[in-house]
């Protein structure tokens, strides 16, 4: 067992990805240095309470608002979120990053009645999930469920077709890319949902998920997201 542990420690060293200190993927000092974001409309970026979609953008979008914790434009935030997408041994780091999100939500007093909301992590297609072996948004959602006392649903929202990476596309292409990529498999009429994702850029993916939920009768659809890429909208 000691030999296996040494091999594991060699292959996957437990060092802070910010400063290199041992025994953690993200030390307290580097966690405090992560750039937090203020609340703003997820589409036009105008300041808004709780990150609610502003009146103007409500006319064109289905998502009611988005809590976003971290600024993805900060190199360290970008590095951490990118690594958690494809390296499952960094699961503990996802928990660390989600702490920044839970802190913001708790301070806001947004969840006065957590039992009214159901968490829906943005899904992968079955093929992509099998290839990767995990979905990082489900891990984030599990942490939020435990920290905030929310319900978690992994079956209602499904991704039915593969899409290109949104980061490679312009705004019009992003909207077209995610069009009709989600389907609803259970009754959602009158229910309130919170979508969970690791990153938002234009908001097209979250808005598409909100659209299909509301087409089936969902009442409110918000989003909880780790980071926002402010360099590309």
Predicted ranges, named:
Residues 1-196, 201-233:
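Glycine-rich phosphate/pyrophosphate-handling loop used in enzymes and phosphotransfer proteins
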């Amino acid at each position: 067992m000691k030999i296996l542990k040494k091999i594991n420690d060699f292959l996957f060293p437990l060092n802070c990805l910010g400063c290199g200190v041992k025994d953690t993927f993200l030390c307290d000092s580097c966690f405090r240095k992560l750039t937090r974001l203020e609340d703003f409309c997820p589409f036009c970026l105008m300041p808004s309470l709780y990150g609610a979609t502003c009146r103007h953008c409500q006319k064109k979008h289905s998502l009611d608002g988005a809590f976003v914790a971290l600024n993805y434009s900060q190199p360290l935030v970008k590095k951490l979120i990118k690594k958690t997408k494809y390296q499952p041994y960094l699961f503990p780091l996802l928990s660390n990053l989600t702490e920044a999100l839970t802190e913001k939500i708790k301070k806001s007093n947004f969840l006065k009645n957590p039992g009214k909301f159901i968490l829906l992590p943005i899904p992968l297609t079955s093929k992509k999930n099998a290839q990767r072996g995990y979905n990082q948004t489900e891990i984030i959602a599990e942490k939020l469920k435990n920290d905030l006392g929310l319900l978690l649903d992994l079956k209602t929202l499904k991704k039915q077709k593969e899409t290109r990476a949104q980061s490679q596309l312009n705004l019009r292409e992003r909207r077209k890319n995610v069009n009709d990529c989600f389907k609803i498999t259970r009754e959602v009429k009158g229910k309130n949902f919170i979508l969970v994702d690791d990153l938002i850029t234009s908001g097209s993916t979250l808005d598409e998920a909100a659209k299909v939920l509301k087409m089936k009768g969902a009442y409110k659809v918000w989003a909880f997201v780790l980071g926002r890429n402010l360099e590309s909208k």
